[in-house]
Amino acid sequence: MSDQKFISIRGAREHNLKNVDLDLPRDKLIVMTGLSGSGKSSLAFDTIYAEGQRRYVESLSAYARQFLEMMQKPDVDQIDGLSPAISIEQKTTSRNPRSTVGTVTEIYDYMRLLFARVGIPYSPATGLPIESQTVSQMVDRVIALEEGTRLYILAPIVRGRKGEYRKELAELQKKGFQRVKVDGTFYEIADVPPLDKKYKHDIDVVVDRVVVRPDLSTRLADSLETCLKLADGLAIAEFADKPLPVGETAEGGSANKSANETHERILFSEKFACPVSGFTIPEIEPRLFSFNNPFGACPTCDGLGTQQAIDPNLIIPDESAALKDGAVAPWARSSSPYYNQTLEALGKAYGFKVSARWSELSEEARQAILYGTKGREITFHYDDGLRSYQTTKPFEGVIPNLERRWKETDSAWSREEIERFMASTPCPACNGYRLKPEALSVKIGKKHIGEITEMSIRKADAWFRDIDGSFNEKQREIAARILKEIRERLQFLNDVGLDYLTLARNSGTLSGGESQRIRLASQIGSGLTGVLYVLDEPSIGLHQRDNARLLDTLRHLRDLGNTVIVVEHDEDAILTADYVVDIGPAAGVHGGKVIAQGSPQDIMANTNSLTGKYLSGAMEVAVPAERRKISKTKRLRVVGARGNNLKNVSADIPLGTFTAVTGVSGGGKSTFLIETLFKAASRRIMGSREHPAEYDRIEGLEFLDKVIDIDQSPIGRTPRSNPATYTGAFTPIRDWFAGLPEAKARGYQPGRFSFNVKGGRCEACQGDGVIKIEMHFLPDVYVTCDVCHGKRYNRETLDVLFKGKSIADVLDMTVEEGAEFFSAVPAVRDKLETLVKVGLGYIKVGQQATTLSGGEAQRVKLAKELSRRATGRTLYILDEPTTGLHFHDVAKLLEVLHELVEQGNTVVVIEHNLEVIKTADWVIDLGPEGGDGGGEIVAVGRPEDIVQEKRSYTGQFLKELLERRPKRSSQAAE
C-alpha cells in the first residue's frame, strides 16, 4: 500500500482503544460508527485529529505556538499519510452575546463592506437620500443644465435657528459679501430688517450670480468652494428665472442628479449631511456597521441590542395573591413592617386595603405601587416597635427604586438580588438592531443592514440575488465581488439545512448540531483542499428531509480533494459513505476494537457487526405490539402558543403516555415544548423564574407535581463532579467506608472519604490527582501527583479497605464493576444499576464530568431520575435524547423511557429519529417548513395517523420505515 493513498495508523491505544491498526483511504468520505462509548471519538478525534493538528502546530515558530492550543501527543505508535486537520465538533459556537450567525459565518463582514461601498444614507427627517459630492461633481451637475440658465450660488449659513444674527451679518459685510437671502427674500446686507430672536430663520449668503455656459467651470468651482467653507460643507444653486423643468437632465445627467434637488434649487453637500435636519454621517466605512466597535455600536446598549430592565411580571408573579401575603415579590421575603406600612399609606391615598388581591386593584393604584406617585405627596406612618414617625413625600415606586439601587450599588450580592427581577428587553434606542442611528440610516434597496440580518437565510439569499437590479453601473461593478462571497456563503447555509435561521440569531442559542453545520458551511466557503476534516455527528437536530442536502455537502467537501472522517450513527450517512469503520464490540472496556471495515455492503455482510445487523434488518428497534390508550380527560392542553414563529398553536399532550414532538428544523418544536410548556409549567409547579414564550393558557397542570427537563448540558463544570456524586451514589459509598471497622477504629467520618474537603484528601494536589504545570510554548502539562500517584486521597484514608479495595479503587471501577462490587449494599447498587440500565455501564464511577459527552451527561441525568421514588405525576421533557446513540443504544434508551411511562409519568421528547417516533403513543408534528414557513400543527395523533397526512414530511419518511420493516417481536433489545 502506498502511504500517499492511505492514512496508516499503527498501535492506537488512546483511552479504551486496544492497540488498533487501521488503514483509511485518503480523499474519501469515511464514517466511523459503533456503540456509544466504544471508542469512535478516541480514534477519530483524540488520535487522528490530535496528531494531525499537533504536527501542523509543531511546524510553526515557537512565538506562534504560544498563541495556539496544542494537543497532547496521542498514545499511538505511528501514523503516516496525515494532512493538516480541522475538527468540527459538537460544541456550541460561542456563548459571547456579541457572536451571531452573521459574524461566525463572516457574512456580516462582507455585508458591512457592501453597505460601506454602495449603501446610500437617508435623512431620518426627510426620508430623502443624503449624498456627498466633490466640488468637481457639483460643477459637472451645474454645467449639465441648459445653457443660459441663470443661477444664484448661495451658502446656507443658518438653517431654522432662532436669533438676531446682527454680528454674523456684520462679519459677512466686512468680508466683502453684499447680498443675503433671509427667510426667502433677497436683501442688501445693510438693508436686512431686524430679526425677531424668538423665531427660527433661514439665511443664505449670495456668493455669486452666474449664467450657465461651457467655460464657467473655474469661476463656478471657486464660488462653490467659498460656499462650502462658509456653510460648513453645504452649497445651493438656485434658479433665478424659472424652476428646473420636471425630469430635466443633460446628457449623463441621471447618473449625477442629486436626490436633494427641488424644482427651485439644487442642494450640494460635501459631507453626508441632511440639509434640512443637519443629520450628519461621518465617512461611511465598514466599522460604522460593526456593533463590536464603538464607532458603530448603539451607545445606549453598547451594541448588544438588549437591555436589562425590571420586568413587572417578575415583580408581581401571581396576580391572585393579596398584598399583605407578598404579592409584591421583592418585598415578600422581608420581615420588616416597613413595606406593609408603605402599602397601607398608599391604600389610604388610592382607596384599597392591604388584604386586597393585586387583580382587584384599580389601574391607578397599580401604577402608583409599581412606578411611583409622580410628584403626588403621600403621608406615611412608620412604627417598627422601637420608634414611631411620620413623613410626607412622593412615593418613588417599586420599579424605579430597584432600578436606582441596581445602578448605584457596589455590592455584588445586592445587584444579583435585584437581577432576579430583571429581564432582557430590546434596546429602545436601536430597536434591537445594535447599531447607531447613523449606521441604520444607510440603506440598499430601501433596507438598512439591521433589517437584512433579521431576515431568514432563505429570504436573505433571495434578496441578495435580486438586489443588483437596483444598482447603477458603477455600484454593480463595486458590489460584484462582495455579492459573490455573500451569495456563496448563504447558499452553503441553505445546503446544510439552516435556511430558517436569521443572521442576527445569537450563536449561544444554537443547538450543537446547528453550530456544527454553521462551521461546516464556513469550511466549504473557505474552499481548502488536501485537508483532513473530522466531524462529530453533523446530522444532529436535522430532519430526514434535510439529511440528503447535508450528505451532498459532505460529498462536496470530499470532492474538493479532502479526507472527511465523520463519527455518525445516521443510517443514510453510513450507507452513503465510501468507507465505514465499525468500532466495538461493546462500550468502554468492552470496546476499542475494529469489528468491521469496508464498504457499507461489507459491514452488512459481517455477522460480528451490530451496526451491520441493524442496517440489514436482521435486528431492529421494535414497534410496540399495541400502543397505550389515550385518556380523554387526563391531558395537558397548551392554548394559543405564539412564541418565535408559532402561529397561535393549541395542542393536547395525553398524560401517562410517550409523546414525540416532531417536524423539520426550525419548525417550532423547541419553542412549543421548552420555551412555552416547560417554562410555564416549571414556573407554576416548581416556582422557577424562567420566562415562558407568549401563550394564552395551559390546562391540566393540576395532574402534575414535577416538571423536569433532561437536557444535554454538562452534569458539572468542574473535574470534581462525576457520575457518582451527581446520581447520589457517592454519599452511601462514603458512608459505607466510614462504617467499616478500620475506619471506626480510627474515628473517620464520611467526610474523610471526600476529595473536596481537607482531612482525607491528598493536600499536595488538593484532591485533583493531577497538578497543572503551565508551559508557554507547549500545551499545559497535567502531571500525576507524585504524593498520591493520582489516587486523590492521603495514605491513611487509602488504608481503609473493603474487599481489598480502597475508596480510590472504587472510583476507578467501571459502573458495571461497581454495581457487582456493591451487590450487597442496595443503597449503592441500585443507583449504579440505573446507570447500567441507561447504557452507561462502561464509564468510570469517578469519571470527571467534563469528559462526558452531551449524550452521556443526559443519560446520567436520566439514571438519577430513574433511581428516584416514582410519584407517577412527573412530566419529563427530553430534547433529542438519541444524540450520540447507536441503533442498539436507542433500543435500550426506549426501554428506560417506556419504564418511566409505565410508572404513570408522562414523557415528551423532541426527536427526528424515526426509530423513536415509531414507538411513540402520540405524535405532534409541527411545520410544515422551518422559520416563517413553520409554526403550525401539521398532524397530530398516533404514528399510524401521521403517515396519512400528505403535508407532513415526518409522515412521509415514517410511512417508508413502517412499510419497509414489518412489526416484529422485541428481538432488538436482546
Swiss-Prot record:
Disulfide bonds: none
Gene Ontology process terms (BP): nucleotide-excision repair; SOS response
SUPFAM superfamilies: P-loop containing nucleoside triphosphate hydrolases
Location relative to the cell: Cytoplasm
GO molecular function, one term: DNA binding
Annotated ABC transporter domain residues: 331-610, 630-959
Zn finger region (C4-type): 762-788
One Gene Ontology CC term in the entry: cytoplasm
Entry-linked Pfam families: UvrA_DNA-bind (PF17755), UvrA_inter (PF17760)
Keyword tRNA processing: no
Binding-site residues for ATP, renumbered to this chain: 34-41, 663-670
Principal cellular location given in the protein's record: cytoplasm
Keywords carried by this UniProt record: ATP-binding, Cytoplasm, DNA damage, DNA excision, DNA repair, DNA-binding, Excision nuclease, Metal-binding, Nucleotide-binding, Repeat, SOS response, Zinc, Zinc-finger
Family in the record: Belongs to the ABC transporter superfamily. UvrA family.
Role, per record: The UvrABC repair system catalyzes the recognition and processing of DNA lesions. UvrA is an ATPase and a DNA-binding protein. A damage recognition complex composed of 2 UvrA and 2 UvrB subunits scans DNA for abnormalities. When the presence of a lesion has been verified by UvrB, the UvrA molecules dissociate.
Oligomer status and interactors: Forms a heterotetramer with UvrB during the search for lesions.
Name assigned to this protein: UvrABC system protein A
Taxonomic path: Bacteria, Pseudomonadati, Pseudomonadota, Alphaproteobacteria, Hyphomicrobiales
